[in-house]
């Protein structure tokens, strides 16, 4: 016991020193600004900080590639399908078409004897259509439904403690006694919905799969995740490859689709190589049920700065698994399609909410760095502090740099995006990934200020992604974007005013002309490809897209 405690202390000290040293090293490289290569007048330069970021991308891509090779080899691994699995679907104001597609895909799952529990966040007449769809798809004779006036933590009107306790027992018994169950309960957010499913199931099953009501599951998705959990008893949770169902509905959903592929098949695949996936996504994940019941109450009652957390449910669930010392994995062999916002404002609200949960969970996650591979510490430092370095770089360039410095920065952003997207195109075998370089502009213009706004309002839970039947009318997410563009525009105007006081030399004029032409040509080429390739593919929107999961 004393030996284990001593080793634990050493690991805490080691990971802390490693993380602090890494952050100080990167900060020093950024502040000193040592340049490996530079031309006269600093038309072009490549420094130590840039080399660190480039090395990170190379290492990340390498381990992602190695993890994908391991996934392919696991195809031949035989498993016994004798473990009990329950699928928990969280539903809230869902679009009828998406919900039907979700439930139809659930019926096609190949894992035998799977229990299905759909919990609806809301018990009003306006929510009843979701229960009716459940009955229609799953069959009236083979499912049990219940409209609950309350939930596990809130009483209904005029209800006593005794009747509340009886209703909880009724819900639990119904879940245990039936294979397909749909429950409508008093509204209290997604975490309440998930808690109901987990609590009612108890320890009656081996594995619990989670799913959102806008998700279309691949028939083999459950089998593939069970395979990962069966291969290693120290794996506590596993996530699958989440792709976009409505990717051709708008430019924002299309860019989200290429970003999703990168996030799962590069970033999470790399994390999976070291057994420390930071977030098992809500549309497609599976956990050991025995672990869930070790922390279900702490997970539900999570607080931050004195307030109970109402978002980031899936990320915190993953963090709870990591806190016990269990590994979390990703498998590209388990796939699903899910809906993503098609409107800019809804997307921005979603990203801000996700950024809030990321930074909040980053702090919680840091408590368990010592229980996992050093890569977990390394990546947390790199990705956690990168936005701050980037903002400092942009402001410095726009207010202290020259015109060609700003132009060079814009070209560099696109070049890095193009290199990363080219590797993704080769790995995926699909040229569509080249549009990932498009996403870099969206990141710089919208995600970066949204992240800063998320930190400033991290304890505010009053807005986020709304139900799909709700029109987004909250424009507060545009505030940081407006401030950010004002800062950038001010920098450009200031730089131009300063440059007019000193005539450009011939070499400066050439650099500006060539750079501007290259940048313009790049965008013309990319936009032409988008119109010719993506708009043509958009005609497939009317096809039954649940069949595209295997693509």
UniProtKB/Swiss-Prot annotation:
Subcellular localization, as worded in the UniProt entry: Cell membrane; Endoplasmic reticulum membrane; Vesicle; Golgi apparatus membrane
Cytoplasmic side: 1-11, 67-374, 424-429, 492-509
The UniProt record lists the keyword Kinase: no
Transmembrane segments: 12-32, 46-66, 375-395, 403-423, 430-450, 471-491, 510-530
CDD domains per record: GT2_HAS (cd06434)
Cofactor field: Mg(2+)
Enzyme Commission designation: 2.4.1.212
Protein's GO biological process: atrioventricular canal development; endocardial cushion to mesenchymal transition; extracellular matrix assembly; hyaluronan biosynthetic process; polysaccharide biosynthetic process; positive regulation of urine volume; renal water absorption; vasculogenesis
Matching SUPFAM superfamilies: Nucleotide-diphospho-sugar transferases
Pathway in which the depicted protein is active: Glycan biosynthesis; hyaluronan biosynthesis
Chief site of localization: membrane
Reaction equation(s) it catalyzes: [hyaluronan](n) + UDP-N-acetyl-alpha-D-glucosamine = N-acetyl-beta-D-glucosaminyl-(1->4)-[hyaluronan](n) + UDP + H(+); N-acetyl-beta-D-glucosaminyl-(1->4)-[hyaluronan](n) + UDP-alpha-D-glucuronate = [hyaluronan](n+1) + UDP + H(+)
Mode of membrane association: Multi-pass membrane protein
GO cellular component: endoplasmic reticulum membrane; extracellular vesicle; Golgi apparatus; Golgi membrane; lysosome; plasma membrane
Keywords: Cell membrane, Endoplasmic reticulum, Glycosyltransferase, Golgi apparatus, Lysosome, Membrane, Transferase, Transmembrane, Transmembrane helix
Extracellular side: 33-45, 396-402, 451-470, 531-551
Family annotation (Pfam families): Chitin_synth_2, Glycos_transf_2
Subunit structure comment from the entry: Homodimer; dimerization promotes enzymatic activity.
Family per similarity comment: Belongs to the NodC/HAS family.
Protein name according to UniProt: Hyaluronan synthase 2
Source organism of this protein record: Xenopus laevis (African clawed frog)
